[in-house]
Amino acid sequence: MPSPPLGVVQRRLTFTHQRVYPGLTNEPRHWVRSNPQATAIAFLMRDDNGVAQLWLISPQGGEPRQLTHHATGVQSAFNWHPSGKWLGLVLENRIACCDAQSGRIDFLTARHDNPPSADAVVFSPDGRHVAWMEEVKGFRQLWVTETGR
C-alpha cells in the first residue's frame, strides 16, 4: 500500500462523533478550503438543529468554530475572497459574503426565483467581482456582480 512521502505528517483535525449531527455535511456538496493565509480551513457541518453552517478550524488543530448561525443554512459550496477576510456562498437563494471573523452576512444580490447553483461562488482574482451559475428556463447561465470589497 502506498504511503505518504517521508517526512509528511497527517493529522486528524475534527472529532465530531459526540455531536448531535456528527461529521461534516455532504449536502450541499462542498470541498474544504484554506484561506489564502493558510491560517483557517473552512467547511460545512450541521449545527445542533441539523442546519448546514459554515465552520472554521485552524490547520494546527483545536476546536472548530461555527461561523454562520443562519436558520435556513448554507445552500452551496463556498470560496474565500482573495483577501481572506470573507467567504462567498449562497444563502436564502441569494449570493452572500460572510465575514470570516464575525460571521456577519452581507447579501450581494436580491432573492432569486431560482436558487443560484450550489456548485460554487467564485471571486475574481482582485476580489471586486463574484460569479456564479443559475438556471434560467432550463439552461444554466453565468452571472456576475460587484462585491464592494
Where do the protein language model's features map onto the residues?
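Sequence signature of WD/YWTD-type beta-propeller architectures
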Residues: 1-149
